[in-house]
Amino acid sequence: QIVIFQKNVASDLDAPAVAWRVIKYCGQGDNHPFTFPLGLQVGASDSHGNCTPQLEAQYGQQFQMAPSTAGDRLTPAGYGASSKEVQVLNALPQGAINASCYKDGRLLAVKTAIAPRQKAVFEFKPSIWIGVASHIQQGQIMNSAIVSQMNTEISLLGISRADIVMRGGGSGANSRPFSFSLENVVMC
């Protein structure tokens, strides 16, 4: 399986990564088209297991999970401290929340157990990480041992479209490690 993810550079180095996209059974000579949009969405869940709808987010924007007469709600709350980040503030009087960041409607990153008056901060470089792993599901939080084996970072800065080419694999003495590179790059 081919796993594609991003790293939240606003978090500590040990922050868990989420398998944003998992490509299965892609045979030799096959391709698997996908888009990597610029936009993000955010969502949150409270300590009661209630989940908010995903809201469109722009870098620099802050959101807050706050009580309302209809229950806990996630709403835009102006701008955060940095134009490179999306922030989710826990404005509930009690109870921790989880904040999630999505790209193309798929889970991209998560920050758990955010206490009242604390916030989750999401910041991503314009790059993806890609590698090969088994038994990973899309949206799964990956442990650091798996992430450390996926060390190919591909910068998407200024790229409109490209092909990611995978080489390597096979069995026996002639097998080679998997590698990934960009080809047929079209710049913006």
Task: Name these PLM-found stretches.
Residues 1-188:
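Intrinsically disordered, low-complexity segments enriched in small/polar residues
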